[in-house]
């Protein structure tokens, strides 16, 4: 991870001619044995400054323009003029041919020195203080305390209790907050940090470190700071900082959130642009300045080689995790904040790289007079020595604040003992841990009382001289905070601001520049992910061809028979254009965390980002619109007129932007994606139904007509229809009456059958059709355009406002979650407090253990295990005598052009009862070795031999080991005990009884000390187990499997605080003491942690062994080995791990004096290892037994038992996931209520029948929302299975997949039943069935179809996600297939009018059979009752009754009826007499109902079978995979 930093530092080291300096930064950095950013001697720095100020072109440019330039930061002056003889930036920095060039200032030079660069910039600024206005910022806080809302110990939400739980929370919100409902996160504390100082904050998770950093960085969102607290920044208040100077005080959270598709350079360059000051170096323009600062930041933090590499994330491949962390650090460094708060910024970095980061901060502080506060969990001694001050916290109490060099003595004087080789930081943190701190023997012998609780230690602090001195410093600093100090900061900030930037704004560049730079960034993103836009255009073009060609045949007639289909095609067009932007909500939530972070850095307004995103999305939207609409318009054969087409295109573009801005508003108004999808889905349904096609405006029920009036698409659809039909005369396609008996009739004796026809006319005017059918008038054509534009503008500004002012979800403190039944039991037993104090905000760390816990001492190996003998009695952990050993292990992976060796002839063994550490530099192959030994690599070639008691590994091996991954992966809804039992049930042999497995689980809980939270739910960060508890559970899950051979642990202490790391090592030590064999990778542990291990296997770069052997007491055996091979002496107080890394050249700035792999292979120790391996291979096979047939099985449990247990667990998870289930049911209820009451009790008129048909069509649109909710749930299950449970052989893929099928079905049956009960009766289908005398059969079959449809949604979702990695991709594919199935189901275009080519799509669409059956079940076998406007009116021949006149026609047509057959003046004729005739026009028939049901069930079965096959094909490892093992003879 830090190799690139090391390369830079090595070059700097070689170029450095002096190692001492009177400069404070140089003095601090020069104290360490291996140095990173080497300092220059004071004389060299001053000489460099003189050279730059006398010879540089900057100075010349300044001199030449002195007459015309002035120092007002906001005048048009020469500093913005870009000199034509500069290459990007002044040649002093970048052009080697320029006189005075210094390579130490050139970030592209191998000799670049960040210290020299910072010093040079400081010299430039101080050379002209009136222009550059240098300033600094410190912070003092007095009586600072913070509080948050108290949280009950929560109970697990379930499907049954979530509603009363939410109601209870709602009632609490209505009540005024009481004092007992809050708790103090921070007790009153004080501090003073002056410019140029570094402060380290130490404390365990939950002690208040994060809250302190947020409080002093004016970032108190989520908690409250007491009114009497004083926080002052040179006289500025927290409110001043938030409103006007937010960018001067920055809080950096530990998470690394970036736009994954941007390169490292683009990410940092955007930040540099936003922070380029107006009063920058004279003669350098903005772009050159930003570019140079970006290159300096990349060179400083070892990122230059990643310049054009994507930053990436968990899903997008990019830079490594450590490099991503450095990008985050560089981002803050470019911001140039004068006061910086770093919250666990070194997490994910090894100690060497973390040290380089602290040194960079020290350089900035010493030279640039910045102030920085760093909360750090594991801090080496070298890093600690760089800090000026330290603050120690415990349980919200301040235990110490003062000089870092005095802290150790302070606590020793208090009565605590610091063991040898323990770092000062670890010692200070251990004071807060009852199980780790050691009371000095001298105090014990004298009987002196030593403060032990946080409150006692805080009181001791308040009585100390150090506290009195601190108060004096604070008071003195507050007195200096005058108006003059505030004016200096105000003037400096104003000088940095660009023209037209409001003086009160915290931003450096103005709003227009922000939008400009963000536009460029967005276009970079689009270029990096151009394939997404390309596929969107291609996909929409294909859909245009498909949908357009569907109407191609019927539209060619251009007569009245096309009326319905023209409306349907127009409806399709506007919906497709409008809803093409629905999935923009996903991208909003992808970028929101970045925007919120940049807002706190004061880079840009969130609304500027929103503005830029809208502008940058215009080109792809317009391209997509052009491709779709040109193809669709001309394929459908809409009106061929240039003006008409462009109006059509204009309206559809407006529809696109209207709905785009509306969905963006929804996304900005909500705080999570889940919150946004529900209202978005509801809006989609409402807008679709009330556009005016599914149910015309004149037919909308009175209670819901307001929805039409506020629906923007209603007006746009009206304009489109007017545009298509106005001033057109459509020839009549069918007359009434017609036939052989009516050849000679003329005039008013016949009429066209289309709506809007007049007797005697052989055509229908388009305007008449629109007026009669939709109540549309031509004068409203441009009204729709105007209203649409108004909506676009309105939603756009609402979107900007919401983005600017909508804050993210507040962070919550941590709480433990139990099952509700268990909470009642615990409260009854008195084991649970009524109130539980949440832990540290933001980091979601666990609250501190009870400070009254019995004091324990650190024990050496001979007395390991702090449990009493009674505690250890009866422990039944699996013990094994088998020895695991390997020899000449090599691992090669294919790369471009050949093979790359990762492991090179590694030997070793792990014996029962021993704890072996696997160490090495970053990239040495530690985790790879662990994976090879555990059979977890998925590609490459393994050579060498891996034995168990002298026998090569066999099929029983994977079941005989436990593997604890670095990530703590668990099912969040299970309790601790349930997780352990699940592992025991499925991984222990089936011959072991359930009772015995349960007893063994209890033993595991006991030895891991998890009794207090054994019934707690695993949960998620902040609401469940904390970091340490999760790590214990990870180990427990593997122990519950009763591995008879050994346990592998990968980086069990990575990312943990020192106390939790110590507890984890103590736990491993305890397991080894009880006979467990353990092999553990660990990254540069502290000296105290190193003493817990028995043996060490150390690898260097290239996977080569440097040492394998005993560590000895105090690591003496290992130290003696290296010293005997020529290494320099290990200082008595040094960390042996860091000393060893330095010796072998694995630490930054260090160089090995010899090849220690060669030294090892030529050593006596190596020969002893080989002899031991020879003995093992010769003698161990005879004492071991051959694995039984049972042990050779891939899984301990049968497939049936696996399926049973996994299904039970999954049912349990669904029950405990109310968000997913209630979202499904709420969407179902809303959709069906909305549809049902929109078409409430539809009558049997022609319009009523069409409404009932379209209601069935709309009934299916719930497919997409339900599908999109299901996919993430499956992905979570699959990730857990594939990452942990499949490699550990817990259960097979078939049991996993079948359980996914089975468990989803009952909930879909329930959802389908709910939908049926609401929809079927609300629309009025039951009335039709009752009138036909078929109430029970039709109702039952309709119900079966309803539940089958919801099961079909689940089957399609499973099919889509079975082979897709990402839920979004599966959702896109599912939506596309559903759209095609719905388009060809026969509703919008009947099979009679479809081109012959598409008939096969009609037949393969599963919705064809469902909608055919539902329509028949809903309306078949009853009479039609036309409304008055649907009756065709004409006059019969004189002297003839209507009945006689129409008899021949009715007989020929087979349908139709007269309202009054005896009438002789006006005949009122309805063209359809029965609903069966209506069904026939859509090729629907009642007799096919059961056949259609059977076919639809076959589709569901096919989906499940295909999904199972595709999952096996794409995701199940095959035995003939990419991994090959070649044992050596």
From Swiss-Prot:
CDD domains from the UniProt entry: ABCG_PDR_domain1, ABCG_PDR_domain2
Binding site for ATP: 920-927
Pfam families per the UniProt record, alphabetical: ABC2_membrane, ABC2_membrane_7, ABC_tran, ABC_trans_N, PDR_CDR
Entry's Gene Ontology molecular function annotations: ABC-type transporter activity; ATP binding; ATP hydrolysis activity; ATPase-coupled transmembrane transporter activity
Positions with biased composition (Low complexity): 14-24
Primary site of residence: membrane
Protein name: ATP-dependent permease PDR15
Protein's organism: Saccharomyces cerevisiae (strain ATCC 204508 / S288c) (Baker's yeast)
